[in-house]
């Protein structure tokens, strides 16, 4: 199965995206939740056999250290632990400022380029806004959290034999058929019925394709809420 997703520019870019979902000051975000979402994203890439760059793995090991120390009983305050968290948040804040400046400069460059040359036409589905201001990466991050929960359930089922012959076209047809009957379904409900991780992945990719083609419509009422598929646009 050949899968292509637009990646973040680096681990700090991913962390900034996760932190920004909370709509609060960087230093007030629930750091353990952010770490868990980052690790879920990395694990999902690995399950889907997508390449994970070394700097992402290095950051993952650092985040796991922070998380483990956070979850330990606090008999004595760990100054080193606080330093690790503070250093991480400062790096995210610094990257946020750098990215804002970079985007402003890029916008100015694009404006000037309009006067001197024909704009280059690009079609990048992986970074496209789908519906309700949701991008493919927004849905993928939500999916990675669901995937983590599903992996935990399947680990307790030792009788399941993995298949690798799920066809995206078949899954698309199955989702459309179900929507004909129910009009509205949540991806979580569909995933609960899956017996293997390959089946979960295939259904997710089929959903993305249906959304891209505007055959079904996607809705997510909150940043970390359920992913809802609708037969008709709300």
From Swiss-Prot:
UniProt xrefs under InterPro entries: ScpA
Role summary: Participates in chromosomal partition during cell division. May act via the formation of a condensin-like complex containing Smc and ScpB that pull DNA away from mid-cell into both cell halves.
Name this protein carries in UniProt: Segregation and condensation protein A
One GO CC annotation: cytoplasm
Keywords, in A-Z order: Cell cycle, Cell division, Chromosome partition, Cytoplasm
PANTHER family: SEGREGATION AND CONDENSATION PROTEIN A
Localization of this protein: Cytoplasm
Assembly with partners or alone: Component of a cohesin-like complex composed of ScpA, ScpB and the Smc homodimer, in which ScpA and ScpB bind to the head domain of Smc. The presence of the three proteins is required for the association of the complex with DNA.
């Amino acid at each position: 199965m050949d899968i292509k997703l637009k990646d973040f520019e680096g681990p700090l870019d991913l962390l900034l995206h996760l932190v920004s979902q909370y709509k609060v000051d960087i230093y007030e975000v629930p750091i353990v939740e952010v770490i868990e979402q980052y690790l879920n994203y990395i694990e999902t890439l690995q399950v889907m056999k997508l390449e994970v760059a070394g700097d992402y793995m290095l950051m993952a090991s650092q985040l796991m250290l922070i998380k483990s120390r956070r979850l330990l009983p606090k008999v004595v305050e760990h100054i080193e632990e606080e330093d690790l968290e503070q250093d991480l948040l400062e790096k995210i804040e610094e990257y946020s400022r750098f990215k804002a400046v970079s985007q402003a400069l890029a916008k100015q460059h694009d404006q000037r380029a309009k006067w001197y040359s024909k704009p280059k036409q690009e079609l990048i589905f992986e970074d496209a806004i789908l519906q309700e201001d949701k991008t493919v990466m927004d849905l993928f991050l939500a999916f990675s959290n669901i995937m983590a929960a599903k992996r935990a359930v399947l680990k307790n089922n030792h009788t399941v034999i993995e298949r690798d012959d799920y066809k995206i076209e078949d899954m698309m047809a199955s989702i459309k058929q179900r929507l004909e009957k129910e009009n509205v379904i949540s991806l979580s409900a569909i995933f609960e019925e899956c017996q293997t991780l390959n089946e979960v992945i295939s259904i997710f990719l089929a959903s993305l394709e249906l959304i891209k083609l505007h055959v079904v419509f996607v809705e997510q009422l909150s940043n970390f809420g359920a992913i809802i598929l609708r037969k008709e646009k709300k």
